[in-house]
Every structure is written in C-alpha cells, then in structure tokens.
Amino acid sequence: MKKLTMESLLVYTFVMGVCFTSNLTCEQKIVLIQEQKLGAICISTCYVNGVLAGNSSCVSVRTSYLINLAMLTDGFKAMKVGNITSISEKTAFLRVIINYYFRGVMLRALIAKRLPNAAQLSSTVNCWLEGHSAGGVMTLFYGTERIVLKSSTEMNASQWTSDGPDANGTLNILNERVSLDSYFLSMICPQLSDEIYKKKVVHSKYFSLIKNDTMPKKFLRNTWKSAWTNWYKYKEIEALLDFSRDYENVSEITHSMSAAGLFFLAGGAFTMLLLLCCLSMITRKHVVKDLGYK
C-alpha cells in the first residue's frame, strides 16, 4: 500500500473537514462622508472559517461567483417558497438577496427609507454547516440598536427582532416576506458556505470573494438615496435593477484634487523661494555695509 505523504494527508484532512464544518461570515458597513462630492462609502469584509477572504468596496464583491455557487446547492434546486418556483424566479431571488446581504444593498435601502440621519449602518451575515446542523444569522447594527434574524433547519419559522425600541419602524419592512430571508439562511447559505470552503481549500493561494480593488475606488454618490425612497422589500425580484448605479468612480475627483494639490504645492514653493531671495538680498546688503563697502 502506498504511504501517505504529509501533503496528501493534509489535503485529506481538509477534504474530510469540508464534510463536517464550514462557516461563512460577511460584514458590510456604510459610513456617510461629509466631504463635498463624496456621499458615503460601503466596505465589505468576508471570512471563510475565520480566514480573511476579501476586504474592499461593496461593489467589488463577486456576486456572480456567489450566485453560481448558490445554484449548486440542494436548497436552491428544491426551493419552493411563495410564488418563487421557476428557475428564472429563483435565480432572480438569489441575485437580489446576495446583493442585499453581501453588497450592502439592504443597508442603502433602509437608510433611504427609514434611517436618513444615520451616520453609519452595518450588517453581518453568518451561516454554517456542521454535520446535520445548518443555519444562519443576519444582524443589522444601527447605533446601539441591534436587529437580528436567526434561522436553521431545526426552526419552523423565524422573525426579525430588535433589542431596542425600533422607533423607525424598521422591523415592519424587514418582516415583509421574511420567509425568503429565513429560507436563504437555513437552506441555501449553509450549503453555499460549504461550496465556498471547498473552493478555498483547492485554491487557497488565490481565493477571494471580493475583487482586490482599492477601497476608496468606488463611493456612493450624493444622489444615491433618491432611488430607494419608494423601495419595498424584494421589489427587485420583479424589476431587474442595476445595483451598482449608486456608485461613483472618484478617480477623476482624485486626479483633480491631486492637480489642485500640486498647484498649491508649486505656488507655496515659489513663494518660499521668493522670500529666501529677498532675505538673501537684505542679508547681503547688511554684510556689505558692515564691511565698509559701498
């Protein structure tokens, strides 16, 4: 019998581990910026079994990759929730919910609809598959308030709950069609985390759920809220919207700021040189006078 090398033993251990434990955590954070021309920035960070798998602008999340992996799950293939039964409807649902909870679209919609004065809002999606246990948790953080949805294969039904007063009526929106959130958390996301973990084991060196873009490359433009003021939950399943339209590439702004900076730097250098010349002339005049020269 051929002996196992240390490398093959490690691979075997990893593959066996895939069958028992996988954990996916992604956090999105929107921070409003007061500076002119920059409305806000959305940052997404993902971890696979505790190991960083991407950190950049929310618009850089590999949504197509996540959707394709989610389509491999049994939860997607067997999905029959509400009036979502056909492949096209289920694919539209995946596209929307992954944009909602992995690219910060839900945060943008809630800020525009219910939390216009929020300076910062964040959300976390965590789902796992461990043996026969599978489930997930979605958490929204607004100030000191935390809004949570928990769902698993052992739970029959679940609702969004808040540990605060929910003065803005956010729960009313979140609990619309909550069965779709719950199904994704319990039946699709855990298996998605397993598919992601398998890919990470095979391609550990180059694996990432988020494109390696510079964080400040994409900002939310000042007008991004206007598109979401009439929003209601999962409207995008029926209407195919471009989720990236809220973003603005600020390379031109950066270049103009750099040009302005160079202009002021050059102007400052010229002024300093002029002052030094004047000082040199005055000093030379005094030296000549002290030496008795006319």
Swiss-Prot record:
Keywords (A to Z) from UniProt: Host membrane, Membrane, Signal, Transmembrane, Transmembrane helix
Name of the encoding gene: U18
Membrane topology: Single-pass membrane protein
Subcellular location: Host membrane
TM segment ranges: 262-282
InterPro entries listed in its UniProt record: Herpes_UL37_HHV-5-rel (IPR010880)
GO CC aspect terms: host cell membrane; membrane
Main subcellular location: host cell
UniProt source species: Human herpesvirus 6B (strain Z29) (HHV-6 variant B)
Similarity annotation: Belongs to the herpesviridae immediate early glycoprotein family.
First and last residue of the signal peptide: 1-21
Name of the featured protein: Putative immediate early glycoprotein
One Pfam assignment: Herpes_UL37_2
